């Protein structure tokens, strides 16, 4: 991948455009996909903290496990909290609600300092060396736990930002995880251009991500009417729809104890009374949002369609499957 990153602009432009034509995707999306894979390869193989991070989230579902046909713009990373000075089990110690809240805030503050003072300056220097030019890397002003890599883009597209967001948090569970191979779209279609066409990345197991997504939908089903659902949240419904069509669903059902692990984690580190996480268990789990949410969710899904490829289901089809999945989960015997 490094050889492609340093190709003349005209060669990269031709590579990304030809790949996009073959896939029926926008040029800018194919280009960004390459830089996402390049960045992952650097982070997990050459970065000083390569042994202290785990890949998670929607991008892992598409790139690592080929479970969804959705282009994901961001890289979600779990940072081993031992990098921040905590012992392995320290965050799990029993505390009062007040003390736990203080601990959570302190852990997030430590992560922000680490990213600003160590991580960001280091990768800026190292990626500049790899690219042979100044790498544009900085902390997001609105989210201090997000590092932005403004990669050297040749194409633009209003549906996607020409930057990669590295969303890095220490308050996340990094098990179970497995090694997965990740390959840029361009390498799939033009493998001979690449000296190295794929990379091995430590990634959260999709069974856990299945239950993570299910608890997000439960959270949204309980969101107060006065509170708007965040933009692009329809992606979570689509992701769970697609995962439910794969063997991951049965694997997740066979490991239903993972759901409790996910719920316990969220209740400890991301508590929110109205989310009713204690009800996110077989028998009472909610995936389907209230009727009054559906129009806004359908509009959000329509706005996200540019990020989907292959056989794109209708919103109605997605919600029908989600409704059936809710019934299936609630019929699981504990």
Where are these regions (language model features)?
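Structured mid-to-C-terminal alpha-helical surface segments
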Residues: 1-53, 65-69, 81-334
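Glycine-rich beta-strand-to-loop/alpha-helix junction loops that act as flexible
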Residues: 55-59
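Betabetaalpha-Me/HNH-type nuclease active-site subdomain
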Residues: 62
């Amino acid at each position: 991948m490094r050889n492609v990153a340093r190709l003349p602009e005209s060669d990269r432009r031709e590579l990304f455009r030809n790949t996009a034509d073959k896939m029926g995707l926008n040029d800018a999306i194919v280009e960004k996909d390459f830089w996402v894979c390049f960045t992952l390869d650097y982070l997990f193989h050459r970065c000083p903290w390569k042994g202290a991070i785990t890949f998670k989230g929607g991008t892992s579902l598409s790139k690592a496990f080929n479970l969804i046909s959705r282009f994901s713009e961001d890289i979600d990373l779990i940072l081993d909290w031992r990098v921040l000075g905590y012992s392995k089990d320290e965050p799990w110690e029993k505390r009062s609600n007040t003390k736990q809240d203080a601990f959570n805030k302190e852990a997030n503050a430590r992560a922000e300092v680490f990213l600003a003072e160590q991580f960001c300056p280091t990768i800026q220097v190292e990626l500049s060396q790899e690219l042979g030019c100044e790498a544009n890397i900085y902390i997001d002003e609105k989210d201090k736990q997000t590092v932005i890599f403004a990669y050297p883009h040749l194409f633009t597209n209003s549906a996607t930002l020409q930057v990669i967001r590295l969303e890095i948090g220490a308050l996340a569970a990094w098990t179970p995880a497995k090694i997965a191979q990740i390959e840029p779209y361009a390498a799939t279609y033009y493998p001979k251009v690449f000296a190295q066409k794929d990379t091995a990345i430590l990634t959260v197991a999709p069974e856990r991500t299945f239950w993570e997504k299910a608890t997000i939908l439960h959270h949204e089903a309980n969101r107060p009417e006065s509170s708007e659902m965040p933009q692009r949240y329809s992606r979570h419904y689509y992701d769970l729809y697609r995962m439910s069509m794969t063997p991951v669903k049965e694997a997740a059902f066979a490991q239903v104890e993972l759901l409790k692990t996910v719920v316990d984690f969220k209740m400890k580190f991301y508590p929110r009374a109205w989310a009713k996480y204690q009800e996110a268990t077989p028998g009472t789990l909610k995936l389907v949002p209230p009727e009054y949410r559906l129009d806004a969710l359908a509009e959000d899904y329509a706005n996200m369609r540019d990020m989907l490829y292959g056989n794109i289901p209708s919103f109605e089809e997605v919600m029908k499957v989600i409704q059936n999945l809710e019934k299936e989960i609630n019929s699981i015997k504990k």
